[in-house]
Curated annotation (Swiss-Prot):
GO CC annotations, alphabetized: cytosol
GO MF entries: 4 iron, 4 sulfur cluster binding; carbon-carbon lyase activity; zinc ion binding
Metabolic or biological pathway: Cofactor biosynthesis; thiamine diphosphate biosynthesis
Name the record gives this protein: Phosphomethylpyrimidine synthase
Cofactor requirements of the protein: [4Fe-4S] cluster
Gene: thiC
Cofactor, free-text remark: Binds 1 [4Fe-4S] cluster per subunit. The cluster is coordinated with 3 cysteines and an exchangeable S-adenosyl-L-methionine.
Reactions accelerated catalytically: 5-amino-1-(5-phospho-beta-D-ribosyl)imidazole + S-adenosyl-L-methionine = 4-amino-2-methyl-5-(phosphooxymethyl)pyrimidine + CO + 5'-deoxyadenosine + formate + L-methionine + 3 H(+)
Organism expressing this protein natively: Synechocystis sp. (strain ATCC 27184 / PCC 6803 / Kazusa)
Keywords recorded for this protein, A-Z: 4Fe-4S, Iron, Iron-sulfur, Lyase, Metal-binding, S-adenosyl-L-methionine, Thiamine biosynthesis, Zinc
Length: 459
């Protein structure tokens, strides 16, 4: 779809959506996003120019259907997929991608760490994906030196980052905010550093006693991103891994640096979103969102959960969806899904489905709470169908139509029950929605009540 659009930008040194927006140019991607979001295209342009919205759209990902991440747009959901050294292959990863898109993922991150040729896996995912693809290039950098962290050089990082950009990756997690002076701040934590990328950088700095190479070479990464319109997803290496560690000095020190890096990227018209926690008690979620907006000049916030309690392994799609809905309500732009397998193992197809649906619920609830235009229309349509016992319409409007129909049909599978004015919960005699009160009956009641009130007042 975008082949002709990007062809017109050949030969330009900066092809980012922010660069065009700041020049007053409305790109085809901005126009497409405006229609998808039902927002004025001028608003899209202004939000991108300001940095409060990003349109992750690498010029080499031409089959992409452009979308927006920002406080003015609908709350988005990301799904993680990826092969590991112990499982998965190309076909399985493409299947996970298509499953993620089917159940509503707005973006997908390929977090592959093994399981075959990572370049081949990534290229297959990008070629099959209509949604933006994100990666964490440090994983492949580590794989390129066979897991020997101390052997990594800044050039290794830059080489892998450019390769991902050339292949069409739309946004990359760059762990540039973890500075060597922040490492002692994790001593009082229960779970230390829980970011895989952050852990790699921390070990590198501890071995070499040198500053984070992604920080010292940040300007070189900016130059790569300008050429391909790759968006930064600034990684929160010091995100809390349990509720005890939330909002501590380590997390907030890194957040301040992420804000500085955000503005540095903006000086070169490169798009940025900022990643956030993690594990956060309910009473600290609003603070975390507002603090990010303050420190990062309202760049879009992209959070993992957050989980609001640590005691429910096997159910962390629920513990985190609670936090995600609250974070979205307070202004978080994108939610990274968590599956029931979080902390336990690699998710399968059913885990991906359950995680995504939980997060689509959270994002939609946030849109309703923020009074986004049209956010509740689907709810109202489904409620009307429910009241009218239009079962097929209810299934159609559900976030997961297959699951809704499956549960209904467990007890009432025959087609005749698709027009029945009851379900198996109440049966045919006790459903309160059978009590249809029409306008004429209400008018008669109002007349009666008015007369009754008049008689009482005359006594």
């Amino acid at each position: 779809m975008r082949t002709a659009w990007v062809a017109k930008r050949q030969g330009q040194t900066n092809v980012s959506q922010m660069h065009y927006a700041r020049k007053g140019v409305i790109t085809e991607e901005m126009d497409y996003v405006a229609k998808r979001e039902n927002l004025p295209v001028e608003l899209i342009k202004d939000e991108v120019a300001r940095g409060r919205m990003i349109i992750p759209a690498n010029i080499n990902h031409t089959n992409l259907e452009p979308m927006a991440i920002g406080i003015a747009s609908k709350c988005k959901v990301n799904a993680n997929i990826g092969a590991s050294p112990n499982s998965s292959n190309i076909d399985e990863e493409v299947e996970k991608l298509l499953l993620s898109v089917k159940y509503g993922a707005d973006t997908v991150m390929d977090l592959s760490t093994g399981g075959g040729d990572l370049d081949v896996i990534r290229t297959a995912i990008i070629n099959a994906s209509p949604v933006p693809i994100g990666t964490v290039p440090i994983y492949q950098a580590l794989e390129s030196v066979h897991g020997s962290i101390e052997n990594l050089t800044p050039d290794d990082f830059l080489h892998i980052i450019e390769k991902h950009a050339q292949q069409g990756v739309d946004y990359m997690t760059i762990h540039a905010g973890l500075l060597i002076e922040y490492l002692p701040l994790v001593k009082s934590r229960i779970t230390g550093i829980v970011s895989r990328g952050g852990g790699i950088i921390a070990k590198w700095m501890l071995h070499h006693h040198k500053q984070n190479p992604l920080y010292t070479h940040f300007d070189e990464i900016i130059e790569i991103f300008k050429k391909y319109d790759v968006s930064f997803s600034l990684g929160d290496s010091l995100r809390p891994g349990c509720t005890h560690d939330a909002s501590d000095d380590a997390q907030l020190s890194e957040l301040k640096t992420l804000g500085q890096l955000t503005r540095r990227a903006w000086e070169h018209d490169v798009q940025v979103m900022v990643e956030g926690p993690g594990h956060v008690p309910i009473d600290q979620i609003e603070f975390n969102v507002k603090k990010q907006m303050e420190e990062c000049s309202e760049a879009p916030f992209y959070v993992l959960g957050p989980l609001v309690t640590d005691i429910a392994p096997g159910y962390d799609h629920i513990t985190s969806a609670i936090g995600a809905a609250i974070a979205g309500w307070h202004g978080t732009a994108m939610l990274c899904y968590v599956t029931p397998k979080e902390h336990l193992g690699l998710p399968n197809a059913e885990d991906v489905r359950n995680g995504l649906i939980a997060y689509k619920i959270a994002a939609h609830a946030a849109d309703i709470a923020r009074h986004r235009p049209g956010a509740r229309d689907r709810d109202d349509e489904l409620s009307k169908a429910r009241y009218n016992f239009d079962w097929n319409r209810q299934f159609e409007l559900s976030l997961d139509p297959e699951r809704a129909k499956e549960y209904h049909d467990e007890t009432l599978p025959a087609d005749i029950y698709k027009t029945a004015e009851f379900c198996s919960m109440c049966g045919p005699k006790f459903c309160p929605m059978q009590t249809k009160v029409d306008a004429e009956m209400l008018e008669e009641l109002e007349v009666f009540l008015a007369k009754d009130k008049e008689m009482v007042s005359q006594r």
